[in-house]
Amino acid sequence: MSTYAGKKAVVTGGTIGMGLATAKALVKAGGEVIVTGRNEKNLEAAQTELGPRGHAVRSDTAQLSDIDALGGIVEEKLGEIDLLFVNAGFAQPGPFGHVTEELFDTTFAINAKGAFFTAQRLAPLIKDGGSIIFTTSVANDSGNPGMGPYAGSKAAVRAFTKVIAAELLPRNIRVNAVSPGFIHTPTAGITGASPEMLQAFEKIGDEITPMRRHGSSEEIARAVLFLAFDATFTTGEELNVDGGLGQRINRPQGQ
Protein backbone atom coordinates (compact mmCIF):
# COMPACT_ATOMS: atom_id res chain seq x y z
CA MET A 1 0.00 0.00 0.00
CA SER A 2 1.24 3.49 -0.81
CA THR A 3 2.63 5.66 1.97
CA TYR A 4 0.18 8.35 0.90
CA ALA A 5 -3.01 6.26 0.76
CA GLY A 6 -5.67 7.90 2.87
CA LYS A 7 -3.65 11.08 3.40
CA LYS A 8 -5.54 14.36 3.22
CA ALA A 9 -3.96 17.58 2.01
CA VAL A 10 -4.57 21.18 1.04
CA VAL A 11 -2.47 22.67 -1.76
CA THR A 12 -2.76 26.41 -2.33
CA GLY A 13 -1.86 27.51 -5.83
CA GLY A 14 -2.69 23.94 -6.78
CA THR A 15 -4.38 24.23 -10.17
CA ILE A 16 -1.24 24.30 -12.35
CA GLY A 17 2.45 23.52 -12.21
CA MET A 18 4.11 22.35 -9.01
CA GLY A 19 0.96 22.48 -6.92
CA LEU A 20 -1.08 20.44 -9.37
CA ALA A 21 1.73 17.89 -9.78
CA THR A 22 1.81 17.41 -6.00
CA ALA A 23 -1.97 17.05 -5.81
CA LYS A 24 -2.00 14.54 -8.67
CA ALA A 25 0.70 12.44 -7.01
CA LEU A 26 -1.30 12.30 -3.78
CA VAL A 27 -4.57 11.45 -5.51
CA LYS A 28 -2.90 8.77 -7.63
CA ALA A 29 -1.56 7.18 -4.44
CA GLY A 30 -4.98 7.12 -2.79
CA GLY A 31 -5.02 10.47 -1.02
CA GLU A 32 -7.62 13.23 -1.07
CA VAL A 33 -6.76 16.84 -1.84
CA ILE A 34 -8.22 20.33 -1.91
CA VAL A 35 -6.46 22.61 -4.39
CA THR A 36 -6.99 26.35 -4.57
CA GLY A 37 -6.61 28.94 -7.29
CA ARG A 38 -8.23 32.05 -8.75
CA ASN A 39 -8.51 31.29 -12.46
CA GLU A 40 -11.84 29.60 -13.23
CA LYS A 41 -10.55 27.80 -16.32
CA ASN A 42 -7.60 26.37 -14.37
CA LEU A 43 -9.90 25.36 -11.52
CA GLU A 44 -12.16 23.45 -13.90
CA ALA A 45 -9.22 21.75 -15.61
CA ALA A 46 -7.67 20.75 -12.28
CA GLN A 47 -10.97 19.31 -11.06
CA THR A 48 -11.20 17.19 -14.20
CA GLU A 49 -7.62 15.94 -13.82
CA LEU A 50 -7.92 15.13 -10.12
CA GLY A 51 -11.28 13.38 -10.27
CA PRO A 52 -13.51 12.59 -7.28
CA ARG A 53 -10.71 12.61 -4.69
CA GLY A 54 -9.78 16.14 -5.68
CA HIS A 55 -11.65 19.32 -4.83
CA ALA A 56 -10.83 22.54 -6.71
CA VAL A 57 -11.80 25.62 -4.70
CA ARG A 58 -11.62 29.26 -5.73
CA SER A 59 -9.63 31.13 -3.09
CA ASP A 60 -7.46 34.26 -3.15
CA THR A 61 -4.48 33.90 -0.83
CA ALA A 62 -4.17 37.68 -0.54
CA GLN A 63 -7.62 37.93 1.06
CA LEU A 64 -7.89 36.87 4.69
CA SER A 65 -11.64 36.44 4.28
CA ASP A 66 -10.95 33.85 1.56
CA ILE A 67 -8.47 32.06 3.81
CA ASP A 68 -11.04 31.91 6.60
CA ALA A 69 -13.67 30.60 4.17
CA LEU A 70 -11.19 28.00 2.95
CA GLY A 71 -10.80 26.76 6.50
CA GLY A 72 -14.53 26.10 6.65
CA ILE A 73 -14.45 24.23 3.35
CA VAL A 74 -11.50 22.12 4.48
CA GLU A 75 -13.26 21.21 7.72
CA GLU A 76 -16.43 20.28 5.85
CA LYS A 77 -14.83 18.21 3.07
CA LEU A 78 -11.76 16.70 4.72
CA GLY A 79 -11.96 17.25 8.46
CA GLU A 80 -8.39 17.08 9.74
CA ILE A 81 -5.55 17.13 7.21
CA ASP A 82 -2.09 15.57 7.10
CA LEU A 83 -0.42 18.17 4.87
CA LEU A 84 -0.74 21.85 4.11
CA PHE A 85 1.34 22.83 1.07
CA VAL A 86 1.48 26.63 0.95
CA ASN A 87 2.39 27.11 -2.69
CA ALA A 88 0.38 30.07 -4.02
CA GLY A 89 2.73 32.75 -5.30
CA PHE A 90 3.19 35.84 -7.43
CA ALA A 91 6.22 37.13 -9.35
CA GLN A 92 6.55 40.10 -11.67
CA PRO A 93 10.24 40.97 -12.12
CA GLY A 94 11.30 44.55 -12.71
CA PRO A 95 14.24 46.89 -12.07
CA PHE A 96 14.55 48.32 -8.57
CA GLY A 97 13.90 51.85 -9.83
CA HIS A 98 10.68 50.88 -11.58
CA VAL A 99 8.98 48.91 -8.81
CA THR A 100 5.68 50.53 -7.86
CA GLU A 101 4.05 50.52 -4.45
CA GLU A 102 1.20 48.50 -5.93
CA LEU A 103 3.55 45.79 -7.25
CA PHE A 104 5.43 45.68 -3.95
CA ASP A 105 2.22 45.37 -1.93
CA THR A 106 0.72 42.73 -4.22
CA THR A 107 3.87 40.61 -4.09
CA PHE A 108 4.06 40.68 -0.31
CA ALA A 109 0.30 40.28 0.12
CA ILE A 110 0.34 36.97 -1.76
CA ASN A 111 3.79 35.56 -1.07
CA ALA A 112 4.39 36.63 2.53
CA LYS A 113 1.18 37.79 4.23
CA GLY A 114 -0.93 35.20 2.44
CA ALA A 115 1.48 32.38 3.22
CA PHE A 116 1.70 33.34 6.90
CA PHE A 117 -2.03 33.60 7.47
CA THR A 118 -2.81 30.48 5.44
CA ALA A 119 -0.57 28.55 7.82
CA GLN A 120 -1.97 30.32 10.87
CA ARG A 121 -5.65 29.85 10.02
CA LEU A 122 -5.34 26.25 8.79
CA ALA A 123 -2.90 24.98 11.44
CA PRO A 124 -5.74 24.00 13.81
CA LEU A 125 -7.00 21.60 11.12
CA ILE A 126 -3.64 19.83 10.74
CA LYS A 127 -3.32 16.56 12.64
CA ASP A 128 -0.72 16.40 15.36
CA GLY A 129 2.30 14.87 13.62
CA GLY A 130 1.33 16.39 10.27
CA SER A 131 3.29 18.74 8.02
CA ILE A 132 3.33 22.22 6.58
CA ILE A 133 5.44 22.79 3.48
CA PHE A 134 6.11 26.28 2.12
CA THR A 135 7.40 27.12 -1.35
CA THR A 136 10.36 29.49 -1.15
CA SER A 137 12.78 30.13 -4.02
CA VAL A 138 16.40 30.07 -5.09
CA ALA A 139 15.91 33.85 -5.34
CA ASN A 140 15.88 34.05 -1.52
CA ASP A 141 19.61 34.47 -1.36
CA SER A 142 20.84 35.02 -4.90
CA GLY A 143 20.83 38.79 -5.44
CA ASN A 144 19.38 38.56 -8.95
CA PRO A 145 18.62 41.93 -10.59
CA GLY A 146 14.92 42.62 -11.02
CA MET A 147 13.80 40.25 -8.28
CA GLY A 148 13.61 42.70 -5.34
CA PRO A 149 10.04 42.33 -4.01
CA TYR A 150 9.85 38.66 -4.98
CA ALA A 151 13.16 37.73 -3.37
CA GLY A 152 12.29 39.70 -0.25
CA SER A 153 8.87 38.10 0.09
CA LYS A 154 10.29 34.60 -0.31
CA ALA A 155 13.06 35.34 2.19
CA ALA A 156 10.28 36.24 4.62
CA VAL A 157 8.69 32.84 4.00
CA ARG A 158 12.03 31.18 4.73
CA ALA A 159 12.04 32.96 8.09
CA PHE A 160 8.42 31.97 8.76
CA THR A 161 9.37 28.34 8.13
CA LYS A 162 11.83 28.33 11.02
CA VAL A 163 9.66 30.30 13.44
CA ILE A 164 6.49 28.29 12.80
CA ALA A 165 8.50 25.06 13.00
CA ALA A 166 9.61 26.09 16.48
CA GLU A 167 6.12 27.08 17.59
CA LEU A 168 4.48 23.86 16.39
CA LEU A 169 7.00 21.51 18.01
CA PRO A 170 4.61 20.72 20.89
CA ARG A 171 2.16 19.30 18.34
CA ASN A 172 4.90 17.43 16.47
CA ILE A 173 3.91 19.25 13.27
CA ARG A 174 6.97 19.50 11.06
CA VAL A 175 7.36 22.69 9.03
CA ASN A 176 9.74 22.76 6.07
CA ALA A 177 10.21 24.54 2.75
CA VAL A 178 11.04 23.48 -0.77
CA SER A 179 13.14 25.96 -2.75
CA PRO A 180 12.75 25.55 -6.52
CA GLY A 181 15.14 26.86 -9.12
CA PHE A 182 14.13 27.06 -12.78
CA ILE A 183 11.15 24.73 -13.18
CA HIS A 184 9.08 23.90 -16.27
CA THR A 185 5.59 25.21 -15.52
CA PRO A 186 2.99 26.92 -17.72
CA THR A 187 4.01 30.37 -16.43
CA ALA A 188 7.62 29.71 -15.33
CA GLY A 189 6.48 31.36 -12.12
CA ILE A 190 6.16 34.79 -13.78
CA THR A 191 2.76 36.47 -13.71
CA GLY A 192 1.68 37.82 -17.10
CA ALA A 193 4.85 36.82 -18.94
CA SER A 194 4.78 36.98 -22.75
CA PRO A 195 5.84 33.94 -24.82
CA GLU A 196 9.03 35.82 -25.73
CA MET A 197 9.83 36.49 -22.09
CA LEU A 198 9.22 32.85 -21.18
CA GLN A 199 11.51 31.70 -23.99
CA ALA A 200 14.28 34.05 -22.86
CA PHE A 201 13.79 33.03 -19.23
CA GLU A 202 14.07 29.36 -20.17
CA LYS A 203 17.29 29.95 -22.12
CA ILE A 204 18.87 31.82 -19.22
CA GLY A 205 17.78 29.14 -16.76
CA ASP A 206 19.37 26.34 -18.74
CA GLU A 207 22.58 28.33 -19.10
CA ILE A 208 23.09 29.24 -15.45
CA THR A 209 21.83 26.05 -13.79
CA PRO A 210 24.80 23.74 -13.11
CA MET A 211 22.84 20.70 -14.32
CA ARG A 212 22.08 22.62 -17.56
CA ARG A 213 18.36 21.98 -17.53
CA HIS A 214 15.08 23.01 -15.93
CA GLY A 215 13.49 20.86 -13.29
CA SER A 216 10.02 19.40 -13.68
CA SER A 217 6.94 19.99 -11.58
CA GLU A 218 7.00 16.29 -10.75
CA GLU A 219 10.50 16.64 -9.27
CA ILE A 220 9.20 19.38 -6.99
CA ALA A 221 6.22 17.21 -6.05
CA ARG A 222 8.51 14.36 -5.02
CA ALA A 223 10.50 16.74 -2.83
CA VAL A 224 7.32 18.06 -1.20
CA LEU A 225 6.04 14.57 -0.45
CA PHE A 226 9.42 13.49 0.89
CA LEU A 227 9.47 16.40 3.33
CA ALA A 228 5.82 15.91 4.23
CA PHE A 229 5.76 12.20 4.91
CA ASP A 230 9.21 10.60 4.81
CA ALA A 231 11.58 13.12 6.42
CA THR A 232 10.22 12.41 9.89
CA PHE A 233 13.22 13.86 11.78
CA THR A 234 13.42 17.07 9.75
CA THR A 235 11.82 20.41 10.61
CA GLY A 236 12.66 24.05 9.91
CA GLU A 237 14.62 22.98 6.83
CA GLU A 238 14.70 24.38 3.30
CA LEU A 239 15.33 21.78 0.59
CA ASN A 240 16.84 23.18 -2.60
CA VAL A 241 15.52 21.57 -5.77
CA ASP A 242 17.39 23.69 -8.27
CA GLY A 243 19.97 21.64 -10.16
CA GLY A 244 22.76 22.96 -7.94
CA LEU A 245 22.03 26.63 -8.64
CA GLY A 246 21.57 27.66 -5.02
CA GLN A 247 24.83 25.97 -4.00
CA ARG A 248 26.80 28.14 -6.44
CA ILE A 249 28.67 25.13 -7.78
CA ASN A 250 30.38 25.24 -11.18
CA ARG A 251 30.68 22.67 -13.93
CA PRO A 252 34.17 21.53 -14.92
CA GLN A 253 35.62 23.94 -17.47
CA GLY A 254 34.61 23.14 -21.04
CA GLN A 255 32.00 20.57 -20.06
Where are these regions (language model features)?
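Short, small/polar-rich loop/turn modules that mediate ligand/substrate recognition or access, typified
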Residues: 169, 174, 235-236
